[in-house]
Amino acid sequence: MAYTTEVKKELISKFKVHDADTGSPEVQIALLTHRITYLTEHVKVHKKDHHSRRGLLILVGKRRKLLNYVKNKDVNRYRDIISTLGLRR
């Protein structure tokens, strides 16, 4: 599934903390996870696309930093995000 506006709105509505929330760490992690899964499938098909592979690694690093931030702030929120998104850890 491509990264369309509808998908983005759906993810924001699912992970938002309050009504006008678009930038909380939970929302950012959910959006990054969707982009990461999309790029992972792309890189599996196009093995020599190193530019996209680099972008994928950058996104994974951003998500890791956000997850560490949430983990340091509130462990319960961290566990909820991990279980909801199906991430390892």
Swiss-Prot record:
Molecular function via GO: rRNA binding; structural constituent of ribosome
Swiss-Prot/TrEMBL keywords: Ribonucleoprotein, Ribosomal protein, RNA-binding, rRNA-binding
InterPro entries with a match to the protein in the record: Ribosomal_uS15 (IPR000589), Ribosomal_uS15_bac-type (IPR005290), uS15_NS1_RNA-bd_sf (IPR009068)
GO biological process: translation
GO cellular component, one term: cytosolic small ribosomal subunit
Function: One of the primary rRNA binding proteins, it binds directly to 16S rRNA where it helps nucleate assembly of the platform of the 30S subunit by binding and bridging several RNA helices of the 16S rRNA.
Self-association state and partner proteins as the record states: Part of the 30S ribosomal subunit. Forms a bridge to the 50S subunit in the 70S ribosome, contacting the 23S rRNA.
Protein family: Belongs to the universal ribosomal protein uS15 family.
Designated name of the protein: Small ribosomal subunit protein uS15
Organism expressing this protein natively: Desulfosudis oleivorans (strain DSM 6200 / JCM 39069 / Hxd3) (Desulfococcus oleovorans)
Upper lineage: Bacteria, Pseudomonadati, Thermodesulfobacteriota, Desulfobacteria, Desulfobacterales
